């Protein structure tokens, strides 16, 4: 959320900026470049700025297209729901969600090793999206746009490297629209909806567990063991 950077009175915390490398790629690279927007993008640029307007804006910047990462959140929700329904068969068993949060996963790996068996074996929607794009378009470059600085570190994890080439925050994207004089409100719509409400809900606090719970109920409405969720606010 960058609150630590903004609050640092000594000005010793700096954020990595990827605008210039992305602009250079858009200008020089002769292959496809895809923008992948996080579920939280909805409403970030004003109540009247739709996904269709954003898709038009990305194409004007030079991107081949815009993909909603929420569709990969949908896929991973289904995967986690299937794992939950298979593995959780009593009240004392539990599963940890939020595979999409690199800091959450890093904390478990570094401080709570005993909980690793309770973490689904899923990558984040960002990584899943990048890998899918590159499987379909091997020469493609991928640029993820989202609210979280930690995504910049996640893309460079040894077991994840290569899926996403660059990460921009929403502020970086605003700056990019500003310097290129792109007025989102005046753009025409380019509509191509990708995701369901479950995938989009990943943007909200507790949204992942709610999406998994709802999907488990849809997959197995006769399930005997009740699902109870607990939220851990960081």
Segments (PLM) and residue ranges:
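Processing junctions and N-termini across compartments
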Residues: 1-2, 142
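Iron-sulfur-associated redox domains of electron-transfer enzymes in respiratory
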Residues: 16-234
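Iron-sulfur cluster-binding cysteine motifs and their immediate structural context
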Residues: 2-19
């Amino acid at each position: 959320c960058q609150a630590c950077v903004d609050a640092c009175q000594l000005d010793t915390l700096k954020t990595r900026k990827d605008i210039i490398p992305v602009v250079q790629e858009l200008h020089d690279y002769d292959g496809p470049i895809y923008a992948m927007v996080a579920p939280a993008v909805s409403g970030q640029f004003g109540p009247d700025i739709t996904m269709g307007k954003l898709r038009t804006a990305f194409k004007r910047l030079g991107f081949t297209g815009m993909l909603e990462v929420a569709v990969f959140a949908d896929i991973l929700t289904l995967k986690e729901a299937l794992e939950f329904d298979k593995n959780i068969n009593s009240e004392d068993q539990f599963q940890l969600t939020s595979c999409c949060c690199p800091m959450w996963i890093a904390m478990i790996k570094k401080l709570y090793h005993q909980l690793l068996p309770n973490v689904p074996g899923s990558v984040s929607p960002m990584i899943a999206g990048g890998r899918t794009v590159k499987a379909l378009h091997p020469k493609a470059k991928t640029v993820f746009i989202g609210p979280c600085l930690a995504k910049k570190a996640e893309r460079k994890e040894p077991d994840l490297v290569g899926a996403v080439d660059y990460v921009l925050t929403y502020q970086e994207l605003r700056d990019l629209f500003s310097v290129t004089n792109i007025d989102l409100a005046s753009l025409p719509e380019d509509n191509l909806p990708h995701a369901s409400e479950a995938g989009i809900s990943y943007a909200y606090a507790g949204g992942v567990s709610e999406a998994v719970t709802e999907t488990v109920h849809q997959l197995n409405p006769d399930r005997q063991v009740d699902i109870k969720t607990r939220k851990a606010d960081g």
